[in-house]
Amino acid sequence: MATQKLYDLLVRHQDSDAEDLSPDARPHIAANGLRQMAAQALQSAGDEVVNAKTVLPWLMNALGAPGAFVGFLVPIRESGSMLPQAAWAPRVQARRQRKGVWVAGAAGQAVATAAMALVAATVEGWVAGVGILVALAVFALARSLTSIASKDVLGRTVPQGQRGQIQGVTTVASAVVAVTLGLGLRSWGGDLGVGVLAALLGGAASLWALGALIYATIRKPVEETEPATASATADSQTDDDEPGWMSQAAGLWRDDSVFRRFVMARGLLLVSALSPPFVVALSLQGDGQGLSSLGLFILAQGVAGIIGGRVFGRLADASSRRLMIGASLAASATIVVYLGLRAVPGAGEAAWLPAAVYFVLALVHLGARLARKTYVVDIAEGDQRTQYVAVANTLMGVLLLAVGAVTAGLAAWGNAYALLLLAALGVAGAIVGRSLPEVT
């Protein structure tokens, strides 16, 4: 069968891998795996356009939105997609068709991205800024649905040992889009107009719509939920002083030491996620290239995805714990080396240095991202996996706001101080990661 041959080409596996899946899911591993690759790749490709670190700040500037609005982009995008997940979890667990949750989330992202395109094409100034921020908030909420559902569906339809590779393949596919976009922006340079940005956003919206259609065709196993437990979680607990999901989240943090250490390690891994914008900011201070360098940074991110996607996917399947540790240390080392080179007369002014550092950090962040995604899928089973993902992401949303506030305060004194703090957090993350058990 062509489907099986293509899957065998993309994913290394053995027949014994499927023993951890239900018998109903085993005949459809290849088809389900390819459908998830395609849908996730389309979503990731759209992310390259709706990028709160690069493209959206450029759009804000082009529309004449107040500069202060740019500072809200990353917190809204990241925290907005994480904070609601513990509240969503009981409702997701109560559903038998969990792929429908992903489809709904993808549809919501398509609508929000189309709204951004409409704003870009029709209004300017502070009205445009408010419109983009509101659309981004809706986008982030919809993204929280796809995030919580995707790992549950992946865990129920694809065996352990293949999940990291699937995520790696989707990363490579989306990276090709990033390279294409980066080359295009680099070619257009400073002449890129708002109309082109609006068209790019409209195209990105269609990617999410197509991804939703593909994901809807995934064949799920017959036993999808533990209905009694899920229903009780979602509908009962009316006598408690606080909502049921808050009680569950607090209990999970209190009683599960492995989960607690994983969240701590993941929180400290923010070094690879939060440091690139400060590298970009330092580069703008150095030579004043401004927006003309956007394509180069997007290109660097895309090349990193092409190089690291499948490699890190296989490393995550081999040991997601060791990959988390290595990525954390590599990010910290990269920051220290970069700041050291900037202190050397002549070396710190090299035009290639910021893009090279951005490339390395993007590569390292890819490894950290695949590692923690694979680890949380492998560490739990069934509805416990859904709860792990939801509570971890909600806690990460809180941590992101806290660390973001601290680094923003340090950046007021100098971007280098923020980078030094993030480098220290990365070292601490590696130490905590060593205490995690192997799950591969």
Regions found by a protein language model. Give the residues of each.
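Multi-pass alpha-helical transporter architecture, strongest
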Residues: 6, 117-120, 207-219, 338, ...
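C-terminal ends and interior cores of transmembrane alpha-helices
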Residues: 106-125, 330-347
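Cytoplasmic membrane-interface "Motif A"-like loop-to-helix N-cap segments
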Residues: 93-107, 317-331
